């Protein structure tokens, strides 16, 4: 729902898990959102970041670390192609 200025006024905006593409429900209290900062060649933060959302199911299975690693490798390949 939007107000007259076009701003979103919803209290809950559903997200999807970046690793499994599952819908993260409002009752999934184990889900997390990670912002991973981008570094330059000297290892300094550039001010940019990439956001990944992980559902509680992935975290409960112990696949969060490998899922984030896989997503980050995919992101690096996409960045090199552009």
From Swiss-Prot:
One of the GO BP terms on file: translation
One MF annotation (Gene Ontology) recorded for this entry: structural constituent of ribosome
Organism superkingdom: Eukaryota
UniProt keywords, alphabetically: Acetylation, Ribonucleoprotein, Ribosomal protein
Gene Ontology CC: cytosol; cytosolic small ribosomal subunit; nucleus; plastid
Gene3D superfamilies: 3.30.1230.20
Pfam families: Ribosomal_S21e
Residues annotated with N-acetylmethionine modification: 1
The keyword Transport appears for this protein: no
Sequence similarity: Belongs to the eukaryotic ribosomal protein eS21 family.
Record PANTHER family: 40S RIBOSOMAL PROTEIN S21
Name this polypeptide is given: Small ribosomal subunit protein eS21y
Organism from which the protein derives: Arabidopsis thaliana
Gene (UniProt): RPS21C
């Amino acid at each position: 729902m939007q107000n007259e200025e076009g701003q979103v006024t919803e209290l809950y905006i559903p997200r999807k898990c970046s690793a499994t593409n599952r819908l993260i429900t409002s009752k999934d209290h184990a889900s997390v959102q990670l912002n991973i900062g981008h570094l330059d060649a000297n290892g300094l933060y550039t001010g940019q970041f990439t956001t990944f959302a992980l559902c509680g199911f992935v975290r409960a299975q112990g696949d969060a670390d490998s899922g984030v690693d896989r997503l980050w490798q995919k992101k690096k390949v996409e960045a090199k192609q552009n």
